[in-house]
Each structure stands twice: as C-alpha cells, then as structure tokens.
From Swiss-Prot:
One of its GO terms (molecular function) is actin binding. It is a peripheral membrane protein. It comes from Sclerotinia sclerotiorum (strain ATCC 18683 / 1980 / Ss-1). The lineage of its organism: Eukaryota, Fungi, Dikarya, Ascomycota, Pezizomycotina. InterPro entries: EF-hand-dom_pair (IPR011992), EF_Hand_1_Ca_BS (IPR018247), EF_hand_dom (IPR002048), EH_dom (IPR000261), End3 (IPR025604). This is Actin cytoskeleton-regulatory complex protein end3. Ca(2+) binds at residues 55, 57, 59, 61, 66.
C-alpha cells in the first residue's frame, strides 16, 4: 500500500482556501473554484481532468474532501510528481466516505478494486471455511434483542459491539466494511443483524466472508438518510480524512483501526476545526505555486538571454559590439537583482519581511521580458541598418 497521504497541515491549509472561496457554503461551483485552480497555470484540459477525478460523486461541484483531492493533484503536477494527470484517482487519495462511489465507478468501467481491508488471517489455526448467511430463529432473536437494547431514536446502531466479543479487531473491521461500504457513522437494523451474525460466527471459528449477497446488500442501503447533522458541524477536516495528528500506538494496525472505527461510529473526539482567519498567502511552504512559477520564469529568462547572445555572436562573426555588450551587462545585473530578491523571499529576508509579495516580483519579471523583447527588436533594426550601409559601400566600390 502506498505511504502517501494528505497530511493534517495540508488539510488545514486547504480548509482556509475552501472557506474563503465558499463563503461559508459546503460546496464549490466551477466558477468559485476557477481562480485558485487556474492560478496553477496548468492547461485547461489538465484542469478539466483533475476536476473529473476529484468530483467523485459527479454532482458538478466540489465538497471539501473533493477539493482536497483536486488541490493535492494540482500540487503534485506542478512539482513534477506526475508527468500528466493520472487516468484514475490513486487509492490513497480516495476519500474514505466516498470509497463506495469509486468502487461502483470502477466496477462499471471494468477497473473494479476491493475496498481497503486488513489482510485476512488465513493462517490462523482453527478457523473454518463455509460461513453460512442463514440465521437460525434463535440466533436472529438474540441479535434482535441486542439491537433493540442499543438502538437510538432513529433505529440505528452507533456503539462498539465488538468490545464484549472475543473477536480480533482486524476481523471486526473486515465485517464492518463488508456491511457498511458507504462508511456511514451508524447502521440500520438489517446491517446490525448481519454484523452480529458475522462476528458471532467468527467467534465460533468461521472465517469472515469476503462478499455479501446482492439482495442482502440492497437491504443494508435501502432508505438510508443522514440525520447526523452534527457530524458535518463537529468533525474537523483532519478527522474526516482519518488523520490523528501523527499519534503512534504499540498495537499497530489494530489501534489504527480502533480509532477509525470509533470515528465512524460517531464516538471520536469532540474538538472541531474553526477557521482563525489566517492569511494563507503568508504561509511558508516550498510547494507554493508562486514560488515554483517564479523559479520557472527565471530559468526561462536565462535561457532567452543566452539565446539572444548566441544569435548576436553568430551574426557579428564573433565580434562584440559596444551596444550588445552593454545590453548584456544591464541584463546580467537585472538578473542578479532578481535572484537576490528570490533568495530573500525564500529565506524570509529583505522586502518579504514587510509583506512584499511574489506577485510583485512576477510582474517585474514580465516587465523585464518585455524589455528583452524590445532590445531584441532594436538589435535586429541596427543589424539591418548595418547591412544596408555595407551594401551601399559595395555599390559605391562597384560604381568606381
């Protein structure tokens, strides 16, 4: 499995951008997202493909999770992680809450993959094959009693059933993913009965099944309405993505699953992320688009100057005229000045301390580019005059 992930610091940074663009809304339209996406200076066709990949639910808008996906894809492209937009969304970038949509899409296009699961303990001694989905009347009655004693006002279950069962956490996670592919915080009665049946059979020595009969899965997903308004208000952006601030535990995957499982059941931390109004443009990061683009423009300017010098030297037969040499010195001095400004911006020195923006430097580079173009035109006109003078001299010699 890939070690890549969207870090908590990235999520908080993306939230600042999302909150400023959405004006308190939950989704971004194409018009709202266009300014920040086009600021990357990627081609329009690339941005269109990134939008298609990020818009997992195909509703024509981006919610916060989808916006995070789009931003990470853009940053990876700008910084050379990808040569082009990937044909499919990498598994590590798929939002957990939308994994079922991606799986359905891949199934329709012939690229179906399984949901992320902890590996089955196939070598565990004593486990048997032959799991039977049939519930005996006595077992079903027992499951219904547990359900009735723990359901909430809407008839859903949101508590940790596995705490009283002698079942490994990895198997609990496999069973939960199996009956709850949409990663909802609560499950219905039918799904609860199936969940208890799977865990009961695992306790009796049967392996967790890998699939659910289609008819049974349909009953899990029928009439699923999200009443948990607090889930949208309380959960922080980092919590939505399963980020826990880098905490490590000695129990490895089981502990990680426990945290994810509690979060899915709505029993996670109560803290929430609240935008503090931080100016995102002042954030120091090596992945900042303006900085990357400025370095690229400086490299293009250097290449252009070298090209002009080579062309001038070729035309003059290796001789250096006073005017081109002066132009070169001026351009070199200007280039050194721009390099010093870039170093100051990267290190936080110079004008960057009082709020000088990379946008201003980019504007100055555009001005320099225009000056270079003007000097090239002037050089060509002077060369043309020189050629005309040479031609007049030759004509005068011939006439004599």
């Amino acid at each position: 499995m890939s070690n890549k992930r969207i870090e908590q610091s990235e999520i908080e940074k993306y939230w600042e951008i999302f909150a400023s663009l959405s004006n308190g809304g939950t989704h971004l339209t194409g018009a709202q997202a266009a300014p920040v996406l086009k600021n990357s200076q990627l081609r329009d066709d690339q941005l269109e493909r990134i939008w298609d990949l990020a818009d997992v639910d195909n509703d024509g808008n981006l919610d916060f999770e989808e916006f995070c996906v789009a931003m990470r894809l853009i940053f990876d492209l700008v910084n050379g992680e990808y040569a082009d937009v990937p044909p499919a969304l990498p598994d590590w970038l798929v939002p957990e809450s939308k994994a079922h949509l991606v799986q359905a899409s891949r199934a329709l296009t012939g690229r179906q993959v399984q949901f992320e699961r902890v590996e089955d303990d196939d070598d565990t001694p004593g486990l048997k094959d032959g799991f039977d989905w049939y519930m005996s009347p006595s077992d079903k009655s027992k499951y219904e009693e547990i359900y009735a004693a723990n359901r909430d006002g809407r008839g859903d279950i949101t508590y940790t059933l596995y705490s009283s069962l002698d079942v490994p956490d990895t198997d609990v996670r496999s069973a939960w993913n199996l009956i709850n592919p949409s990663a909802a915080p609560a499950i219905s009665k039918d799904a609860t009965l199936a969940f208890l049946h799977i865990l009961n059979n695992r306790h009796e020595g049967y392996r967790i099944p890998r699939t659910v009969p289609p008819s049974l899965r349909a009953s899990f997903e029928r009439n699923q309405i999200d009443y948990q308004l607090d889930n949208q208000r309380v959960a922080s952006p980092a919590q939505k993505w399963g980020v826990t601030g880098g905490e490590e535990t000695s129990t490895g995957r089981k502990a990680k699953f426990g945290e994810t499982y509690m979060s899915r059941l709505g029993l996670g931390g109560k803290s929430s992320y609240r935008p503090a109004g931080t100016d995102f443009s002042g954030t120091k990061t090596t992945e900042d688009w303006e900085e990357v683009r400025l370095k690229k423009q400086l490299a293009e300017l250097e290449a252009k100057i070298e090209k002009v010098e080579a062309a001038a030297a070729a035309r003059s037969g290796g001789r250096r005229d006073t005017k081109p040499a002066l132009v070169k010195r001026e351009l070199e001095q200007l280039l050194d000045y721009k390099r010093r400004e870039l170093r100051d911006l990267e290190s936080g020195e110079g004008r960057s301390k009082v709020g000088a923006s990379l946008k201003g430097v980019a504007d100055e580079i555009a001005t320099v580019r225009e000056q270079v173009d003007g000097l090239e035109a002037h050089l060509r006109s002077r060369e043309q005059v020189l050629e005309e003078l040479k031609q007049e001299i030759e004509n005068e010699k011939i006439s004599r």
